[in-house]
Amino acid sequence: MALFIRLLLACADPGRTLRAVADPAWQGDAAIIAGVLRRRLGAWRSRWAARWQRRGVRAAAVVLCLGLAVWLLGGSAPPPLVHPPVVIGHRGCIYEVENTLPAIETAAALGADYAEIDVQLSADGVPVVVHDGNLWRLAGQNVSVGDSTAAQLAAIPLPASGYATQDGAIPTLEALLAWVAADPARPGLLVELKPAGDGAAPLAAAVLALVEQYDLGSRLMFMSQDLYSVNTLKSAHPEWWVGYCAYSSAGELDEGIWRYDVDFLAVEESMLSNRLTRLARSQSLPLYVWSVYDSDKMLQYLQMGVTGLITDYPDFARAVTDAYRAKNTAAYRLAAPGQAA
């Protein structure tokens, strides 16, 4: 019996030294056994408590990491794009003389949502639709737009070249506004103000007066490389869709551009980058790119988050945009530029 007790205690508490000869007083042995078992049970309880505590810490850490991952993924998700992609015919389209009524009519037939036009002020204060300050490239004549009246400019023929099927003439902005107003199904215009010298104020005032006269603010968009022109239009009509136009020869975009009171940013194709599209999207600022000629690049830009394709080929852009929309059913904040969803 003594030997059995000795072996039991040795197994229960190997570190304890027992008497070589068992005490004939069984009460002493029972006390020893009870003490050893209490210590062992205490040790086992502490060990298992520590294990469960470690497991609890691990479980809590796992839950915390999962929660953090979900938060990060949710927080890093870009905001929805402001409006669906729009097709904008650059100066109308390439298939007729630029900035003329036939070019805009053709752009409309090819599915453009808007036709981009350039507006300057003639010598008699009339907003006319022409890009260059001199007519040498278009007409082969050394004629300054700012030094000529609207009637004189309209009388100068613009010979057809390239894809154009007919000669053109320089229209007034009013003539194009009347064309848009005549049919609500016709595309709108993206009017770019191009003031010369110190002519920003009179040009902006003349454009404002005409658009108000025809009540077409909701069907037009406006932009300029001249910040005064942008601010003038936006201050007069906060509800109009007004953007800033940036070009690569001006250098890198100023970081202050994100503080401009504008509805969109139009950039030259060479300025477009993933960083720029991410920044614009984080600011909920639609990004338009000009001028895009290649269908593959059009699709690439849409996938990057560009929502305005300004192109000489509105037919290409229409096909690319429609195919993209068919495969991408994302939600947008607005139904169209300046229009609630």
What do these predicted regions represent?
Residues 131-241, 283:
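Metal-dependent phosphodiesterase/phospholipase catalytic core, i.e.
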Residues 74-95:
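Ser/Thr/Pro/Gly-rich low-complexity linker/stalk segments immediately outside membranes or between
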Residues 57-72:
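Hydrophobic membrane-insertion alpha-helices, especially the h-region
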